[in-house]
Amino acid sequence: MRHITNTLRCLSFGLLMGLSTVSAAQENAGDIKIVVEQPWARASIGTSRPGGAYLALRNEGDVPVYLVGLRADISAMASIHETQTNDEGVSRMVPAGDIEIPAGGTLALEPGSYHIMLMKLQSPLVEGETFPMTLLFSDGLEMEVVVPVLRIGARSPEG
């Protein structure tokens, strides 16, 4: 009986540890190891306005990697943008080129900075639902991420 109890404790701990990392996706290719953390998107009002998606990319590899693009079937035109603010405080979003994720570093795609624009939505982003998105990297790596949709006014993965 004692052996069964200890086995159940170990299994329970393992399950809890697995659940704590469920929001992180990992992909390895040689010396490259990318971890995706806390992907999320805001709910949209229909399909007439673009949607936004956010996440963090951690490079646990030994060499820099570049995020070069993405695909998302929910959007006819998905791209990475950067919010830039001029000296007068006026902000605008501009397409970003390839974005470096330094070896051992993290790239945050978040409101007011780099972010994913989902233009020409094929269906609305509905709170509580998810959608798949594929990230494209300079080394040819493609990584699919499942993105949960949060409330329309969300400012972070916590809502």
PLM-predicted stretches and their roles:
Residues 1-9:
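Positively charged n-region of N-terminal signal peptides that target proteins for export
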Residues 9-20:
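Bacterial N-terminal signal peptides
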Residues 21-25:
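Sec/Tat signal peptide C-region and signal peptidase I cleavage site
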Residues 26-159:
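Compact, glycine-rich, soluble single-domain proteins
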